[in-house]
Amino acid sequence: MSARVLVGVKRVIDYAVKIRVKPDHTGVVTDGVKHSMNPFCEIAVEEAVKLKEKKLIKEVVAVSCGPQQVQETIRTALAMGADRGIHVEVSGKDYETLGPLQVSKILAALAKKEEASLIILGKQAIDDDCNQTGQMTAALLDWPQGTFASELAFEADKLKVVREIDGGLETIKIKLPAVVTADLRLNTPRYATLPNIMKAKKKKIAMVKPADLGVDVSSRLEVLKVDEPPTRQAGVKVETVEDLVGKLKEAGRV
Amino acid sequence: MTNPLRGEVIRLYKNLLYLGREYPKGTAYFRERLKTAFMKNKDVTDPEKIQKLIDRGDFVIKELEALYYLRKYRAMKKRYYEPEH
């Protein structure tokens, strides 16, 4: 097998950071906030690198769309073992409205350009939680898709994907080329250590513009309002069982 | 006279310092502890003992990586999966 795998990585606000909504409700505060690679993208990168280590594929290419800073995310992917990176430059207004459809178009165009035979993505990003990019990419390319993968194996010229579905697992076999999206249990991503980050600086990151790929990144979606989730109501302490039963009756629970 | 293990020790310190940036209790807390731990052994000269201490440091690196992974995994599981009954 001498295939090339394309892995999409997204730069998001770090999972451990408390998200704050902008006072004017147009979005969330991103300035001066720690960013890192989307956890599900880490799983996708790890899976691709593992396939390479097993010599089932030839090359792992990490792709990210966004402003200059996404190069850090690509660098993390390179430190984890990806061979080279592609930075699709999208900035300013276009980046603010960049959604799954636009990214899918970019990924689909790149997959054709790079002659990739497999695309591995995270199932969703922890910032917008769209869970659409993998599905749309597969649709645009007219490739089969294995979403929510918790196990991946090559079987002859096909790919066996075990999928996480409600209440259990589903095993499917799909033809290559294909799109796979990684679920949480697919693997344990390795840590991008300092020595590896340093070594990754020698790896190449190519710069591409969406226009070079013939992709229009304009969006037809408009964000009307971004709100904080409702805060949880405080509980009450009750002294006796009678009190408790009384309160429950009041609330109509018994 | 510079110790041949000097480079190794510096490498270990740098790697730990880098890992400390993600420490749940904060970078400053971690750096202080890290420095104290290294300074405590600054007078060790026996190469065998230094090697043992380096090995322990490498073990701590593995532990920290495992800690960060588990912390992230648990956060993701809590956010995206129904609690198991």
From Swiss-Prot, chain B:
GO terms for biological process: negative regulation of oxidative phosphorylation; respiratory electron transport chain. It comes from the Eukaryota. Pfam families: Complex1_LYR. GO terms for cellular component: mitochondrion. Signal peptide: none annotated. Belongs to the complex I LYR family. This is LYR motif-containing protein 5A. It comes from Danio rerio (Zebrafish). The lineage of its organism: Eukaryota, Metazoa, Chordata, Craniata, Vertebrata.
